[in-house]
Amino acid sequence: QTLAAQNFTTATDSYNTAVGFEAGNDITTGLKNTLIGGLAGDAITVGGDNVALGYTSLGTNVGGAGNVAIGAQALQTANPGATSSATYNTAVGFKAGLSVSTGVGNQLFGTFAGDLITEGTYNVCIGYDVGSSTQNLTTGSKNILIGYKTSGPSTQSNAIGIGDTVTAVANDFTFGKASNLVTNDFDADANWSRSSDERL
């Protein structure tokens, strides 16, 4: 049933590739989509330049464009409406970016990476369960989270967290592990929480 809903008399789409049960099933005017996997991109109608590889990846995307979803359920709930929101997101990994609905420009790599982001924009999440643990990044923007279960502010922005189970704070650079952290508040005085132990 791939591309089954198309009326080849009236449809104006072109350059689409769909492989899998109901992949790209509803495309009407969307262009240059590559959809591989059962139900991959099956709600796309007008969206274009999307790549979906994996079961239900980009499953509810209707009009979003320029998204890359690789992995089962990656970006599954992106753009459930007919608008052009949820664009230019990249999600690689099982359930990476699962809940992104209208977010733009998120770069998510790893199993469960950024899977609770909904409207957040321009976030970078790299690692297992990043952005999903302590504070559950949802609508915050421009956060950079790297490591194992590193999380950021749910609704705030400009947090950088690197390490093991680190909880990043808005306008702070935090790295280390949960029990032993070093921070720098770059919003105010940019002082480090610990001075150097270098011997002069």
What kind of feature is each model-predicted range?
Residues 1-198:
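Glycine- and small/polar-enriched repetitive beta-structure motifs of secreted/surface proteins
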